[in-house]
Amino acid sequence: MSKIIGIDLGTTNSCVTVLEGDEPKVIQNPEGSRTTPSVVAFKNGETQVGEVAKRQAITNPNTVQSIKRHMGTDYKVDIEGKSYTPQEISAMILQNLKNTAESYLGEKVDKAVITVPAYFNDAERQATKDAGKIAGLEVERIINEPTAAALAYGLDKTDKDEKVLVFDLGGGTFDVSILELGDGVFEVLSTAGDNKLGGDDFDQVIIDYLVAEFKKENGVDLSQDKMALQRLKDAAEKAKKDLSGVSQTQISLPFISAGENGPLHLEVNLTRSKFEELSDSLIRRTMGPTRQAMKDAGLTNSDIDEVILVGGSTRIPAVQEAVKKEIGKETNKGVNPDEVVAMGAAIQGGVITGDVKDVVLLDVTPLSLGIEILGGRMNTLIERNTTIPTSKSQIYSTAVDNQPSVDVHVLQGERPMAADNKTLGRFQLTDIPPAERGKPQIEVTFDIDKNGIVNVTAKDLGTNKEQRITIQSSSSLSDEEIDRMVKDAEVNAEADKKRREEVDLRNEADSLVFQVEKTLTDLGENIGEEDKKSAEEKKDALKTALEGQDIEDIKSKKEELEKVIQELSAKVYEQVAQQQQQAQGANAGQNNDSTVEDAEFKEVKDDDKK
């Protein structure tokens, strides 16, 4: 069975892994980094992903960041006259990670396990799966991030029973899950979270503070300047990271704006205590879901054996202190918060292929599922924190006499009123025979698969007529849309490949020109004028071709110069060999002509010595 890669598709950074033997390995990207920024940039028809896209975000307004926050919505990004869905942007990031894995493994990769926040709803999970398909990946499993982290943490600890709390604060989402580990079984007891809380929000409080300070000092509102805002965002992110290790940091942004008297510079000294004051409300927001997860699991603090911190934002000292205070236990420092989720995804891939044995993963649905009933209320069929996969049926009836159809409004959430919950979709069961209200028997069945994706069936028990759908919310993509996006992605991948090949060719040609110039200089008078002239002409022809856009011309001129330089090198080699032979012959002649002088010698006897 082909390799299944593990991917942590993060809000700010992503990571790709593969199982080697029984150990998950993080694959470095071409820049040598173990994580890749989840950033996509568009410039002159070219798509850039990762570090190169992030670096030019200040000057390029067509840069997309934190797209994960819009998964499962009808949000679109309009760039250069074209609209992109969150699934398409995410697919570009996934495709980049796929290419990284293929370069490392030296083989085609088409299967992956992708992680999502535990609190992702059905629409967000389906959008992630669609993104994988667009990127040319068969998504073998969608796995919750805290569960993946626990899998990576507990794989070598199957000999003991533990209850583990995973506190996952990433770039844009927050989850907390409680798991029971023992005998190779990883059972999720409860999960809670907030999909609109993460590192981006911590950056934002710093940005807001800097904007307010600058306005107070200079009377200029930087929030209205897009380029200034991007510089502030980069500076805020760096300051946040710095304050995890030092007690204060200097934020210096020269020429951030201009006033009546010339350029204006931003200089602010930010202390850790000030940052903690600014972010206090965000940290307190993480405690609500933490308490909820503990309550749902029916556990007290003394029941928790380990607290695992996941996500880059858990490096913030105030976050660590808040978790320690809430749970009353030191946090485990033995896992890398940026990589552990992707490593767990690779392990899950190994479970699927059979490379990892005796591991059973029992996850849960994070939110309750139900349908709207009379009075606009939500009737719950499957409670949150139910182990998946699962199925549940319930019988409903009509609300009025001779009702010909039933509208099934599928909901996900915890509020009592339907309008306050997330609509997953709607469908109708039609052709119900005329009858008094309350007489028809309509059986509604909810199925949740191992990926947490919902299927709903409505069946008229009187006629056995059935209507079955996989939930398609307003933000979901149709099969036709996905197919079109897959083709677009393939075309873009081919175009990107051509661009990479062109860049490589130009670099090779440029390097060849330099080498030829150096070789001609080094050889000096050891090369004939005719040969030198030929090499110079071919070299100049290649330099001229490099100034143009004709790739085939560059390729042919490069080959011509390579041929000339090879012939030249062969000639020089022969000349050097001949010179060495002549030198050796001359040395041999000198040895033969050497004169031998006669010398008298006298034998000395031992008696003469005395």
UniProtKB/Swiss-Prot annotation:
Induction: By stress conditions e.g. heat shock. The modification Phosphothreonine is found at residue 173. Gene3D superfamilies: 1.20.1270.10, 3.30.420.40, Actin, Chain A, domain 4, Substrate Binding Domain Of DNAk, Chain A, domain 1. Keywords: ATP-binding, Chaperone, Nucleotide-binding, Phosphoprotein, Stress response. Residues 579-592 have a biased composition (Low complexity). It comes from the Bacteria. The keyword Lipid biosynthesis does not apply. Residues 579-610 are annotated as: Disordered. SUPFAM superfamilies: Actin-like ATPase domain (SSF53067), Heat shock protein 70kD (HSP70), C-terminal subdomain (SSF100934), Heat shock protein 70kD (HSP70), peptide-binding domain (SSF100920). The keyword Transcription regulation does not apply. One of its GO terms (molecular function) is ATP-dependent protein folding chaperone. Residues 599-610 have a biased composition (Basic and acidic residues). Acts as a chaperone. Belongs to the heat shock protein 70 family. This is Chaperone protein DnaK. The lineage of its organism: Bacteria, Bacillati, Bacillota, Bacilli, Bacillales. The gene is dnaK.
